[in-house]
Regions:
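A short, histidine- and acid-enriched strand-loop-helix "catalytic/donor-clamping" loop
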Residues: 98, 112-130, 142-145
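Nucleotide-activated donor-binding/catalytic signature segment of Leloir-type glycosyltransferases, i.e.
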Residues: 246-266
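Conserved acidic donor-binding segment of nucleotide-sugar-dependent glycosyltransferases
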Residues: 318-320, 324-331, 340-346
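Short alpha-helical donor nucleotide-sugar binding micro-motif in glycosyltransferases
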Residues: 265-266, 273-278
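Aromatic "clamp/platform" in nucleotide-sugar-dependent glycosyltransferases that forms part
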Residues: 286
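A short, well-ordered alpha-helix in the C-terminal region of glycosyltransferases
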Residues: 340, 347-361, 373
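Short hydrophobic beta-strand element within catalytic cores of glycosyltransferases
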Residues: 303-307, 317
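A conserved mid-protein helix/loop that constitutes part of the nucleotide-sugar donor-binding site
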Residues: 18, 202-225, 236, 243-247, ...
């Protein structure tokens, strides 16, 4: 029996396209994706790979209102779009948009099943946000089932009074095959690539927005704490852009010896080159619901150093196994972790093999399996 599913999600994120393609290809699934906006140019410089889309979709008209770090995405046309699609199940990505609530109301009026797809973790709970937490609990109490990417989100949604039977795991995923193949090809031309991209012969890699909350200044400080003999042969590369780039670059000039590079924002094709040449990926973030750059780096066979507040740390990184897990805002422990990985080539090889082995379970197909299971499971769960 075919089940009509609508996924409601914010933007056309490149890493979601393979997942939705896999779900649309499932027997018994009639999928339509409704995007609230094409992209968010203020935060995302992603190329939009619409030519790779193999599922039915539409982008709603939208307006994004900003006030400091906060934004509100407002849409029109959602109710008619849902009436036209007539889904039996809505998979809603998040609860922080007006469209999230509108789709919930539509589901209640039309007797459709409603599944919340959330990456929130306990770290999202902030002091002084009691009103937000109340609204969140009210939203959650109206859902039939829930999709989470991993252990941290699973634990958090349980604190909101949700039973284990109502929670389905759809592991966060990127196109592992794309990154693995690209990395292998790029390593075959490592010397040429380093010269072309003006990269150090050995380097630590950070990928993401260059903003304080990503821990970029902690990483720079940790690099400065490495022994000078090690820094003289090991660079640090910040791949990305953001409001802290200029401050980072100025502080980096004071580190001697050492080489700190800022190649700018990289699309996925160029990212594969950086992953292929790096010795370790470091994500010392202060807050992150997951951290998909870790998936990308592991698909390229990199050891990982990540802060324990990143949602992915509980699922993807084993301490001393394929990397290190450190507390946020602790440059001393971060420096020790970096030193332990970059000094031992044999250890890096073992960690590399383990990263490749673990990330196989975090594929677009596995994520699609979790989404499909939630859509089916929602049918059997009454509110």
């Amino acid at each position: 029996m075919t089940r009509k599913i609508v996924i409601l999600t914010e933007i056309i994120a490149p890493y979601r396209i393979p997942v939705f393609n896999a779900l649309a290809g499932r027997a018994g699934v009639d999928l339509q994706v409704i995007f609230l906006a094409e992209t968010d140019k203020a935060l995302r410089q992603w190329r939009i790979y619409t030519d790779e889309i193999r599922f039915s979709y539409q982008v709603l008209p939208s307006w994004r209102l900003r006030a400091g770090k906060h934004s509100l995405l407002v849409n029109r046309g959602l109710w008619p779009a849902l009436d036209a699609a007539r889904p039996q199940t809505i998979l809603c990505g998040g609860y922080n948009y007006p469209a999230s609530w509108e789709s919930l109301w539509w589901a209640r009026r039309r007797s459709a099943r409603f599944v919340l797809w959330t990456e929130s973790t306990e770290r999202d709970m902030r002091a002084g946000r009691a009103g937000v937490e109340w609204l969140k609990r009210h939203f959650v109490s109206s859902c039939n089932a829930f999709v989470v990417p991993g252990k941290s989100s699973f634990a958090y949604i349980r604190t909101l009074g949700v039973s284990e039977q109502a929670i389905f795991t759809a592991p966060n995923a990127v196109d592992n095959t794309f990154f693995a193949i690209r990395a292998e090809k790029n390593r075959a031309h490592a010397t040429e690539l380093r010269e072309k991209l003006k990269l150090p012969s050995r380097f630590i890699l950070f990928v993401g927005r260059l903003v304080r909350e990503k821990g970029v200044f902690d990483l720079l400080e940790a690099y400065a704490k490495l022994e000078s003999s090690l820094r003289s042969q090991l660079g640090l590369v910040f791949a990305g852009d953001g409001v802290s780039r200029e401050d980072l670059a100025q502080q980096a000039q004071r580190i001697n010896p050492g080489v700190v590079c800022f190649p700018g924002f990289a699309q996925r094709e160029d990212l594969a080159s950086l992953y292929a040449l790096a010795e370790v990926l470091v994500l010392p973030t202060h807050t992150d619901t997951w951290g998909l750059v870790v998936n990308e780096a592991m698909a390229c066979g990199l050891p990982i150093i990540v802060s324990n507040v990143a949602g992915c740390s509980a699922d993807l990184v084993g301490e001393g196994w394929n990397g290190c897990v450190v507390p946020p805002r602790d440059s001393e422990k971060l420096s020790v972790a970096i030193d332990s990985v970059v000094r031992d080539g044999e250890l890096r090889q073992r960690m590399s093999a383990r990263s490749l082995a673990r990330i196989r379970d975090y594929s677009p197909e596995a994520c699609a399996d979790g989404l499909a299971a939630a859509a089916i499971g929602a049918v059997t769960r009454a509110l």
